Amino acid sequence: FCNFWDTRKEVEEWAGDYVYILAFPTAGGQMQDDHLDGVLFDHLMLEGEQKADISNYADLTDLLTSADLKWEVPHDMVEWIWIHMAINAGVTSTAARSGNLENPEELALNLMNSSSELSLVIKAIREALKVVEARGVNLKLYKAELLPYKIPAWIAGKAMKIMFAKNELTRKIMTLHNDKQDIFYCCQSVYQTGQELGVKMPILEANMKGISL
């Protein structure tokens, strides 16, 4: 239930003999003086039964159903998290390029109110997804997740601005995400891997040069 940029083999090495399953919530929030201010949707991503390798998968899904939680099973949970990280890197690096990460809420608000900046986000996400593809991920297996980023950037930017204006919970997730180290980890992980793999990413590169902690 967190962002990571590591391989499945590395995750298995961390876990050792511990029985686990990979999942990811549709959620966001922050801690202030032991108080959690957050948003939790009734939907999560869940590793498929064959790859999860746990004996009580049916019990887990029954539990989710009893709590009125819906789940979706991607082709591969690790790859899905990489894609999620890439999308985050495109969004947050664009937001942060124009200011200091000490005030991420203000940066998020400025971004959500500008269709031109959101259009740039789409282009940055496309570059970040090329990094994921360069790691060996077949993006065609994630068509549904990536469809919004195929739309012409100027149209997508306007649509995103309207979506953020109308969807209070999605907007709140953006403004509550204030862990600057997590934000920087996400951006830096994707960017460094792109450099190592020789991926051309001029927008991400310009964004990263503008970020200050």
Where are these regions (language model features)?
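Rossmann-like NAD(P)(H) cofactor-binding subdomain of soluble oxidoreductases
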Residues: 1-35
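Exposed alpha-helical structural elements
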Residues: 10, 59, 81, 116, ...
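Internal alpha-helical scaffold of NAD(P)-dependent oxidoreductase catalytic cores
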Residues: 14-19, 37-139
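NAD(P)-dependent Rossmann-like dehydrogenase/reductase catalytic/cofactor-binding core
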Residues: 122-213
